[in-house]
From Swiss-Prot:
Name this polypeptide is given: Flagellar biosynthetic protein FliQ
Keywords: Bacterial flagellum, Cell membrane, Membrane, Transmembrane, Transmembrane helix
Keyword Cytoplasm on entry: no
Species the sequence originates in: Buchnera aphidicola subsp. Baizongia pistaciae (strain Bp)
GO cellular component: bacterial-type flagellum basal body; plasma membrane
Locations listed in the record: Cell membrane; Bacterial flagellum basal body
Ranges annotated as spanning the membrane: 18-38, 52-72
Superkingdom, natural source: Bacteria
SS bond partners: none
Main subcellular localisation: membrane
Entry's Gene Ontology BP terms: bacterial-type flagellum assembly; protein secretion
Family statement: Belongs to the FliQ/MopD/SpaQ family.
Function field: Role in flagellar biosynthesis.
């Protein structure tokens, strides 16, 4: 394996990881921001109030984006196994 092939594998793995995790992280971020603004406006300082909506938002985003994330991950895995002989013997 050459340096270029290792870097290409690492780049593709990081790209797939970011593509899969980004919808979940963005939904948790937006939900946390909205709940924090609500808590600041109403002066409610309850820790569980910010935790429960984040879990719900992540679960909803898994339901919405789950099939897309599964297609991305299975395509990457298929490509990785298809090119396995090239990766190990070059």
């Amino acid at each position: 394996m050459t340096i270029e092939s290792v870097m290409s594998l690492f780049y593709d793995a990081m790209k797939v990881t970011l593509m899969i995790s980004l919808p979940l992280l963005l939904s948790a971020l937006c939900c946390g921001l909205i709940v924090s603004i609500f808590q600041a406006a109403t002066q409610i300082n309850e820790q569980t109030l910010s935790f429960i909506p984040k879990i719900a938002a992540v679960l909803v985003s898994i339901v919405i984006f789950g099939p897309w994330m599964l297609v991305i991950l299975s395509d990457y895995t298929h490509t990785l196994f298809y090119n396995l002989s090239y990766i190990t013997y070059s």
